[in-house]
Amino acid sequence: MLTIKKLIIIAIAILFAISSAAQNIKKAEWSKVKMDSSWESLAEQGKESKSTKIINKYKPAVDELNVVIGEAAKDLPAHSPESELSNFAVDAIREFADKWLSQQGIEAKTDMAVTNFGGIRLSNFPKGDITIAQVMACFPFDNRIVILDMPGKYIRQMLQAFARRGRVEALSGVELYIKANKVERFRIAGEPLKDDKIYKVATIDFLANGGDNVYSFKNAVGMTNTNVQIKDMIIDKIKALTAEGKKVDPKVDGRVKIEK
């Protein structure tokens, strides 16, 4: 769990970033606050130091970040080609996208999901209590979940690019086997990939716009933006598991295999 000082820094940084974006700011004011024993001496005199005022001002935001929302059953590493944490994140994206489509009255389901390892900023999510602050540290970017209508031939193109560079992003709903930097076998939604079929792919807007060199997604024939950020979705997913009496306990299932 993050310490109170670290959480204060996070909260102040977030709030400062928000306020700095406002158009009506004309002047920034600041002053030095000594981080020494004068804190305690002022408290003994019944006076409130400047640092205490700062802490009290941001304490509600810090307390909210430090709320425990769930529990990890074990350490959850994140690494390519697949891992417990990446599988949890990308499977959650696909599950969320299916529910979102249903809520919009759309009967179709997603065929696969993709997210990038670069967007998962913790190499290992520790076993034990999970706080909102930890989720935000793991998924700090404002990436929103989108649903693409993708021709199969461009999905194949993307997978071939993954194979050539020797690094696969996190995948859900697929079985992929790469050997000697070539795609030897690929199944999507349990079936062989068809180049002329349109597939629904859940991902994040960063990748949909060609981020991390995933240029194939720019050939989508349709894109729907859910306007839900991945970190908010992950927080809701963990809360839902907790409400069901479950821990976060994803598995590595061999969905992606790579041989040299």
Regions found by a protein language model. Give the residues of each.
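Bacterial Sec-dependent N-terminal signal peptides
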Residues: 1-30
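Short, functionally important structural connectors and interaction interfaces within domains
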Residues: 17, 68, 77-80, 142, ...
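Feature captures C-terminal
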Residues: 24-41, 87-260
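N-terminal targeting signals for Sec/Tat export/insertion, comprising classic cleavable signal peptides
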Residues: 32-64
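Short, flexible segments with low predicted structural confidence
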Residues: 60, 64-66, 126-130
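Acidic/histidine-rich, surface-exposed loop or edge segments in extracytoplasmic proteins
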Residues: 63-80, 214-220
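Mature, extracytoplasmic segments of signal peptide-bearing proteins
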Residues: 79-88
